[in-house]
Amino acid sequence: MRKSYRVKSEKDFQQVFESGDSVANRAFVIYTVEKTENKHFRVGISVGKKVGHTAVARNRLKRYIRAVIDEEKLRINPHVDFLIITRPYARDFNMIKVRKNLLHALALAHIIEEVPDEVEEN
């Protein structure tokens, strides 16, 4: 995913946190803000130390999330900035579980249209 598709600055993160709407499932919290002037969506990803105690684990989860976003970018509303906050429940997720749970959360936030049938439970 190109860097132009990322929310990077602290100012932008705070703007989405403070003025955005949020939805959540057990694995992810999604904050969204409509940006009609955007040519494409922008996403910020946060994986805290409670989720993975090592940088390797946190970076693996971020890599999985970015891969799902990259695969689904044509289905994502282009006029939105959103943040994906990972919860500790997602600590041991593999790529398949990340995909199912993330698509469910994105559908709840109306970032993508279709809601997957079910969310994988441990």
From Swiss-Prot:
Q: NCBIfam families, from UniProt?
A: rnpA
| Molecular functions per Gene Ontology | 3'-tRNA processing endoribonuclease activity; ribonuclease P activity; tRNA binding
Instruction: Could you list this entry's UniProt keywords, alphabetically sorted.
Output: Endonuclease, Hydrolase, Nuclease, RNA-binding, tRNA processing
Catalyses: Endonucleolytic cleavage of RNA, removing 5'-extranucleotides from tRNA precursor
Question: What is the protein's species of origin?
Answer: Lactobacillus acidophilus (strain ATCC 700396 / NCK56 / N2 / NCFM)
Tell me the protein's name.
Ribonuclease P protein component
Name the cystine pairs: none
- PANTHER family assigned: RIBONUCLEASE P PROTEIN COMPONENT (PTHR33992:SF1)
Keyword Nuclease listed? The answer is yes
